[in-house]
Amino acid sequence: MITLRHMKNYLLGRTKVTMQYPEERWDSQLPPWYRGAPALVTDEHGKERCVACQLCEFICPPRAITITPEEIPNDTKWAKVEKRPQEFEIDMIRCIYCGLCEEVCPEQAIFLQKEYSISGYSREEMKHNKAKLYEMGGVKTGLVNKWNEKK
């Protein structure tokens, strides 16, 4: 009975089956819990939120994230207090978009975006470095109150 109803709606033109992809996108139809490509964000002052704690690297099931930490130079007020990533790379081919990296990040530096169309001509293009990840992520304003929001 359900199959006949669907067929009738399709034949009468009530059900739209095909989406003309480059012109039409699914952005408005994505659910709020959709997990797309991971990206890094900066704060409103342009400072990197990532402190190279490497929790996201350790929790990533397919080992798609690699981080090389470095010390912050002595000329800033954050010297010897925090680290920052010298290199931060995510292999988008290996990433399974599980969201564990976003959940474990204590500084809210990595987010899964709504972007679902990631392409490249080679495997090397699919390894996003720190600059590409910050370009995708942009700026995230506000205090880090991740654990207070869940109460």
Annotate each PLM feature.
Residues 98:
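Basic, alpha-helical nucleic-acid-binding regions used in initiation and control of genome expression
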Residues 1-83, 87-94, 103, 107-151:
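Non-ligating segments of multi-cofactor redox enzymes
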